[in-house]
Design a protein with these regions (language model features):
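C-terminal and inter-domain tail/linker signature
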Residues: 1-119
């Protein structure tokens, strides 16, 4: 059976933009990994990586607390059987917009990894 990775990514954006941590984390496997250059800045000891839902929750809660108006504007998605490449614009009032690429790795209908890329 083919999983609908675009639908998973669409749910991801909806949950993220709603700052709904429970809905966002429901898309992830318990032991999922996430990489972001912003993690290196805000939590240097992580070297950019967090692993597991508890760590993901802590990272995103921190981001939503610091940036209560943070929103992502979807520019495009490319999907295959195991991943989605998402391009979006990160909007935060008072900051320059940031164009971002992110890859979601998906297995058995759940996100097992995600990696963020930006300059």
């Amino acid at each position: 059976m083919t999983q609908d990775n675009k639908a998973i990514a669409t749910k991801w954006f909806a949950a993220f933009n709603a700052h709904d941590l429970d809905a966002l984390l429901a898309l992830y496997k318990d032991d999922a990994e996430h990489y972001s250059p912003k993690l290196k800045v805000h939590q240097p000891k992580t070297n950019g990586w967090v692993r597991g839902k508890k760590a993901l929750r802590g990272w995103w809660q921190d981001a939503f607390d610091r940036l209560p108006e943070l929103q992502y504007e979807v520019m495009g998605m490319i999907t295959d059987e195991e991943q989605v490449f998402m391009e979006y614009i990160r909007h935060v009032p008072g900051e320059d917009d940031l164009r971002v690429g992110e890859v979601l790795e998906i297995r058995d209908g759940m996100i097992v990894g995600s990696r963020v890329y930006h300059g």
